[in-house]
Amino acid sequence: MRRSVLACVLLASLLPASYAGDGAAEVRRAAQMVGQSLQAKQPGSLRKLLPDTGKVELSLQRLGPEDGAFAPPQVEALFRDFLASGSVRSYEVVRVEGECKAHGVAHARASVVDRQGSPARVGLHLTFQLEEGRWVLRGMRETAE
C-alpha cells in the first residue's frame, strides 16, 4: 500500500504544470502572454505559444488585416509587420470560458493603434489547445468593441 501511494505521489510530481494545474488559469496565463508580447513589440516571444505542428487561424482587421490559416513562423512575421507601424497600447484578459481540459477560449480587450495611426478598441477571442503539456495558440479573432 505504501509503495502504491509513493508511486502516485511520484507520478503526480512528474506531470507538467499545465496537466497538474488549473486549466482555466493556464489558459488565462497564455492569453496574458500574448498581450505582453504584443505590448512589448516582441513578436518573437510568441514562439513559445505557437504550435509545433499545424496552423493558427487568424481573423484580424486592425491588427492585420489578415484572414486565414498561418504556419507559426508566418504568425510571428505578421505580428512583426504590424508592430513595425502599429501598436497595442493596452491589453486585458476579461474572461476564460469553461474548464479548459484540452481546449480553451479566452476573451481579451485591447487598445490599439493600427498601421494608419488610427486608435481603436478591439475585442480578441483567442483559442488554445493543450499540446504536449503546454497551451498553444490555435486561433485569434478580432471583433469591434
Model-derived segments and spans:
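A short, structured loop/turn motif at beta-sheet edges
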Residues: A40, G98-G104, Q129-R134
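Short, low-complexity N-terminal intrinsically disordered segments enriched in polar/charged residues
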Residues: P16-G44, K48
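Positively charged n-region of N-terminal signal peptides that target proteins for export
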Residues: M1-S4
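Short, solvent-exposed secondary-structure junction/capping segments
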Residues: Q36, L50-P65
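Short beta-strand edge/turn micro-motifs at domain boundaries
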Residues: G117-E145
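Surface-exposed patches in mature extracellular/periplasmic domains of secreted proteins
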Residues: Q42-L49, R89-R95
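Surface-exposed, charged secondary-structure patches
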Residues: F70-Q116
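Bacterial N-terminal signal peptides
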Residues: A7-L14
